[in-house]
């Protein structure tokens, strides 16, 4: 059995789905289950490095367009020495050398730059060809040349995918504002057809499982729904699928329209599973099995090394309007009137940063509320007493899980689905009643009152309750959920564990 994940997204900002996929990779790896994470478009070096930094491994990545070649591996194996010989380079040509790159300069002013792979010592990931300082071509390497990109005015206009002997198996070319694709002697005019051909190359079997993390406006969705192969197909929900007013999230319109073509649905929480069952019943699609699997895990519970600073609160997320961090700022500013030593730190980056900075200044709260930017939070969480979220819906809430794993008391709205999953009223924090129709002034006041109430309480029981809850999300426990789910699906027998 192989589990295929569609897809590792290229061309968009990092998000929680990326982290969820990396967690899944680790869980399946721990079970010894073969897994492939599919790039349906060729990633930039920066995007590939990002996914590898999350914990993905080269051998678990599947590049759709390379399926049309006879390449056996994409793991970097070409050494610097081997490529120097192929390019007939000498040490005298080297003009710059760092841990990550080697630059070779020629008498005519042209240059080559070898970019080394940090995970495979002395191996080259890609080579840039430079003309008068401008990149004109880039070659990617595994055991041999995999892909060549051609640049014009800093952008790729042609990309070729090679067989092991260097000949071209598949080609992408940009013509005006659209891309055309050449497979052998055949011209394909849309990427959906390319994905259809790719799926036929996979030779999917009945015991294989395909997981879709996204379907809306994805050119692989229709070919997957129409696939003749006997493999199973599951949709993983990462967002709210039905809003409080009963409207379906447009992101899942396609999924509900063709719901009966899915074998399984997967949610991140039991709460969303319950709501999804009701939604499917209203759509006349009862009977499709739904499983709840956490989309994140904790390697360990993080203890505080000393006393946590008193009256310390943080939040962490993308600085995005949907996260409503502006409400969190107003909550803390209001609570600060009764808790004059209250300190609130906001971690994360995003387009809302300037607006939030202006709001802090408008409220004259610069001394108590701070934008801290991006940071590795693992050792930061234990330096705080409480975590505040004002997001109005979270399908899981990775930072809530992490904060609970560091023993923080939690505060937020009683809104689907992550908050009531991780915040247990009066045990490890407080939930404020929430509805889309409630005035924001009321929401801010009630949450500010709860924040004051929290800091007037003995926090030790709250911290312990968070640790107790978070223990359910330790890697070994989440891995067991995956094991039980795959066995219940019939995709995994006991003898395969």
Predicted region positions:
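Nucleotide-activated donor-binding/catalytic signature segment of Leloir-type glycosyltransferases, i.e.
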Residues: 355-374
């Amino acid at each position: 059995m192989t589990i295929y994940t569609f897809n590792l997204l290229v061309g968009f900002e990092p998000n929680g789905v990326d982290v969820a996929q990396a967690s899944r990779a680790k869980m399946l790896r721990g079970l010894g289950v073969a897994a492939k994470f599919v790039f349906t478009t060729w990633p930039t070096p920066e995007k590939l490095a990002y996914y590898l930094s999350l914990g993905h491994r080269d051998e678990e990545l599947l590049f759709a367009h390379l399926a049309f070649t006879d390449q056996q591996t994409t793991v970097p194996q070409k050494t610097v020495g081997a490529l120097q010989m192929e390019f007939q380079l000498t040490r005298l040509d080297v003009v710059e050398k760092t841990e990550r790159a080697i630059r070779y300069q020629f008498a005519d002013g042209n240059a080559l730059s070898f970019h080394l792979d940090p995970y495979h010592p002395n191996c080259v990931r890609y080579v840039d060809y430079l003309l008068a300082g401008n990149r004109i071509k880039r070659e990617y390497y595994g055991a041999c040349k995999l892909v060549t990109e051609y640049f014009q005015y800093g952008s790729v206009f042609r990309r070729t995918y090679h067989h092991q002997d260097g000949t071209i198996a598949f080609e992408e070319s940009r013509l005006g504002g659209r891309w055309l694709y050449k497979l052998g002697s055949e011209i394909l005019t849309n990427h959906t057809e390319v994905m259809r051909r790719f799926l036929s190359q996979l030779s999917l079997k009945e015991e294989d499982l395909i997981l879709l993390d996204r379907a809306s406006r994805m050119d692989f969705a229709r070919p997957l729904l129409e696939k003749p192969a006997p493999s199973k197909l599951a949709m993983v929900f990462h967002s709210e699928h039905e809003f409080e007013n009963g409207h379906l999230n447009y992101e899942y319109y396609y999924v509900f329209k063709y719901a009966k073509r899915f074998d399984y649905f997967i949610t991140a929480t039991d709460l969303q599973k319950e709501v999804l069952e009701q939604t499917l019943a209203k759509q006349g699609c009862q009977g499709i099995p739904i499983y709840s699997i956490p989309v994140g895990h904790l390697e360990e519970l993080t203890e505080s090394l000393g006393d946590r600073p008193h009256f310390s609160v943080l939040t962490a997320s993308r600085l995005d309007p949907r996260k409503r961090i502006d409400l969190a700022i107003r909550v803390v500013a209001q609570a600060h009137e009764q808790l004059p030593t209250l300190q609130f730190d906001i971690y994360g980056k995003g387009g809302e940063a300037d607006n939030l900075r202006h709001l802090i200044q408008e409220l004259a709260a610069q001394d108590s509320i701070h934008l801290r930017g991006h940071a590795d939070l693992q050792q930061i969480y234990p330096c705080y007493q409480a975590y505040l979220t004002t997001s109005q819906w979270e399908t899981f809430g990775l930072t809530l899980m992490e904060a609970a794993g560091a023993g923080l008391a939690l505060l937020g709205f009683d809104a689907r689905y992550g908050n009531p999953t991780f915040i247990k009223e009066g045990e490890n924090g407080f939930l404020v009643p929430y509805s889309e129709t409630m005035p924001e002034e009321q929401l801010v006041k009630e949450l500010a009152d709860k924040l004051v109430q929290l800091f007037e309480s003995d926090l030790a029981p709250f911290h312990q309750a968070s640790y107790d809850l978070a223990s359910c999300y330790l890697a070994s426990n989440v891995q067991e959920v995956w094991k039980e789910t795959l066995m219940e699906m019939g995709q995994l027998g006991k003898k395969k564990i």
